[in-house]
Amino acid sequence: MSSPLAPVGIFDSGVGGLTVARAIIDQLPDEDIVYVGDTGNGPYGPLTIPEVRAHALAIGDDLVGRGVKALVIACNTASAACLRDARERYDVPVVEVILPAVRRAVATTRNGRIGVIGTRATITSHAYQDAFAAARDTEITAVACPRFVDFVERGVTSGRQVLGLAEGYLEPLQRSGVDTLVLGCTHYPLLSGLIQLVMGDNVTLVSSAEETAKEVLRVLTERDILRPHDAPPATRLFEATGDPEAFMALAARFLGPALTGVQPVRPSGMH
C-alpha cells in the first residue's frame, strides 16, 4: 500500500491538465503533487491512438517509478487511449477524466440532450459516447473542436478569431438543443467564458477538471491514503518534456502563486 505522504502524479499533453491540477490543489491543499506536461510530444489530439498510448504510458511509467500514490490522467485523449492499459499496468489507483464528467452531466441535464466537445482523437474514439451508453433517456451530440487546443497552448483565450471558431464548432450543438455541455478536453475550461457566451446561459457547462478532483478525493479517502493535515507543507513539482520556460509562461496565467518553477524532464521510455 502506498504511503499517505507520497505525491499524487498528474500528467497531460501540455498545459490543459493544469486545470485538473488547480482543482486538486483547491480541493486537496495538503497533497504533494508532481505534474508532467508532455509539451515535447503534444498536443495529442492529432496523433494516432497507438502514438498517444506510447507517450502516455512512458510518462505513467516514470511517475509510478518515482513512487506516486495515485496517477491522474488529466487528458481526455490519453484517457481514451490508455486507461485500460494503465490500470492493468500499475499497482496504484488510476483516475481519469471521462467518467467523472459523464456522471455529472447525467445528473445535471434537464432535457436529456447532452453535448460533448473534445479533440478529434477523443471524439472518434467514442470514449464519451460509450460512457454515456448506460444512461437512460439521453441523446448525445459529440463535436470535435481540434483547433481549440492550439489557441489555449498559445495563450489565446479570447478575441474575434477564437470567437468565430467557437461559433462554427458549437453551431451543431445549438441546433440539437443540448442543455448540458461537457468540456471533454482539459484545455477547454480556459475557454469556458467564450463557450458560455456562444451557447447561452441556459446551457450548463461541465468541467472534467472539477469532477476529476472530486474523484481523486474519493479514491484517496477510500484507500485511507490522504495526506495528514499535520504533515509538512505540501510541495508541488511541475515538469515539462518540452521548453520549460514556455510552459511556465502559460501555466502561470492560471496557477498563479501555486507555480514556483518548471523543471525539464525526459521519461526513459520516450523516443
Swiss-Prot record:
Catalytic reactions of this protein: L-glutamate = D-glutamate
UniProt entry keywords in alphabetical sequence: Cell shape, Cell wall biogenesis/degradation, Isomerase, Peptidoglycan synthesis
InterPro entries: Asp/Glu/hydantoin_racemase (IPR015942), Asp/Glu_race (IPR001920), Asp/Glu_racemase_AS_1 (IPR018187), Asp/Glu_racemase_AS_2 (IPR033134), Glu_race (IPR004391)
Gene3D superfamilies: 3.40.50.1860
Residues at the catalytic site: 75 (proton donor/acceptor), 185 (proton donor/acceptor)
Residues noted as binding substrate in the record, renumbered to the chain: 12-13, 44-45, 76-77, 186-187
Biological or metabolic pathway of the protein: Cell wall biogenesis; peptidoglycan biosynthesis
EC number: 5.1.1.3
GO molecular function: glutamate racemase activity
EC category name: isomerase
BP GO terms, sorted: cell wall organization; peptidoglycan biosynthetic process; regulation of cell shape
Keyword Isomerase belongs to the record: yes
PANTHER family xref list: GLUTAMATE RACEMASE (PTHR21198:SF2)
Function: Provides the (R)-glutamate required for cell wall biosynthesis.
Family of the protein in this entry: Belongs to the aspartate/glutamate racemases family.
Protein name: Glutamate racemase
Biological classification of the source: Bacteria, Bacillati, Actinomycetota, Actinomycetes, Mycobacteriales
The encoding gene: murI
